Amino acid sequence: MRRIAALWLCALMVFAVGCAGVPSSSSPQAIGTVDRPAPPSLPKPTPAMDPDVLLREFLKATADPANRHLAARQFLTESASSTWDDAGSALLIDNVVFVETRAPERVSVTMRADILGSLSDMGVFETGAGALPDPGPIELVKTPDGWRIDRLPNGVFLDWQQFQATYKRHTLYFADPTGKTVVPDPRYVAVSEPDQLATELVSKLVAGPRPEMDKTVRNLLGSPLRLRGPVTRADGGKTGVGRGYGGARVDLENLSTTDPHSRQLLAAQLIWTLSRSGINGPYVLNADGAALDDRFAEGWDTADVAATDPGAADGAAAGLHALVGGSLVRLDGQRAPRVSGQFGQMPGQTAASLSRTGQEVASIVTLRPGAPDMASSLWVGPLGGNASQVLDGRSLTRPSWSLDDAIWTVVDGNNVVRVIQDASGQPARIPVDASAVVTRFPGAIAELQLSRDGTRAAMVIEGKIVLAGVEQTAGGNYALTYPRRLGYGLGETAVSLSWRTGDDIVVTRTVAQSPVSYVNLDGVNSDGPSRNLLMPVKTVAANPSAVYVADGRGILQLSGSAAEDPGWSEVRPLMSAGALPVLPG
């Protein structure tokens, strides 16, 4: 997994310690469905190629999906090309070994390889691990033009190195169910023409989110809306789209959205998708021949949709808080006084989080930690005010707040619960259906943290990182769906986690050499800096601008850029054994 361990951190600033490998700058598109020129770097078969070389070049050529993998089909006989089914997901493989059985005019080959991940026909990349199951024999025959593949298994196997060179990562954005922000949906695509990028991105927004997000987000660009024509420069020109000051013009048709807020969300989806992909504004957005919003007829900018900024830090004004000696304190310059009210006085607090606004607190009080008769309770109330007990159990995980101010926690290892305030003002405890998670990943859930957009839950289960969608069911309740593992390279060493942004998670671990790591939505993991940390490293709390961890001495903050050899610096007023960082989230 080291080959993919640092693929995603290039976009991070303070947190990046090195960049390599994963394609990071292209648009999503369905594999094998787009007619366009193949990238010039793809190999072609030659008469002098030996079977082994021809097979390796074939695996490289499969990296281009254009025209139903036309580049790869050049390596096949006509009969093999007519029967090869290249639809569906592709497996990304490395360390390929071919074992040949030769005859003068025919060669039979078995293939062994390591699986590094998969790429769906929507461009969704997920990391994987393990040996490639035997796909069946591959047969080559000698033709007048040299060796060609005459029989091969269905499906696509992508050479990892060629995948890196051909595919780029871009992020689509969809609206969260509350309409407060936008949700990332990373995709990978092979693209060679920069001026086609914006059109491909918008086309994929119209096509909709990946299956696991279908019931967790809203798509204001969904059917019957469609793209009228290619995205152009703001003035209608076809070259230089989104580069320099040329801007981008998007013409839509069949718009059914009439209320201003929904149109604002539609614009936010487009603008954040294009902007985060390096396609600069102004963004001229038209629907059915008229401006989407007359106020922005000359063009939108990111400032016009800043309220939905996916990189904004929730409750940033609240600042850093901490549990010190079991009570809640706030960082105030070089001091850390207890907060006023009950949370500053109540002893035995072992985990806490602030609401998204930073004005409310949810805190866990634990009696007799670790003992057979251990007891935990969840207390909720305004920061600086009184607290009310709303839930109890033997163990409760660190609380996490959703965008609708519900508090999520896990009771006694497996029972996920939402706590909300009902119409009478009393707390209501509502079970969350976590059956999909506990069936696939048995074991106690030691941590559950909701993403900043509230549509995903990241969990620590038996030391593994597990991601699931947060889906509201027809009856109004919630379920955790589509669980999958992230960060195979981390093994089973995770202790705590926190969302830094909607696309990446900070993880503390039991590994002294790499006590802090990062993992993104694709599942790619990378090691963070370890300088000045002492084991064990416990709770982590993060937001887009800061990462705090607790080690045996107290709370430390990640500081310095990648060029400055980043390390961990002490938060002096919070250097107390057992202190734990607390942020909104």
From Swiss-Prot:
Claim: Zinc-finger is one of the keywords in the record: no
A Pfam family matched in the record: Gmad1
Domain of life, source organism: Bacteria
Places the protein is found: Cell membrane
GO annotation, cellular component aspect: plasma membrane
Signal peptide span: 1-18
Extent of Pro residues compositional bias: 37-47
Membrane topology per record: Lipid-anchor
Keywords: Cell membrane, Lipoprotein, Membrane, Palmitate, Signal
Region (Disordered): 24-47
Residues with a covalently attached lipid (N-palmitoyl cysteine): 19
SMART domains per record: Germane (SM00909)
Covalent lipid sites (S-diacylglycerol cysteine): 19
Annotated family: Belongs to the LpqB lipoprotein family.
Identification of the protein by name: Lipoprotein LpqB
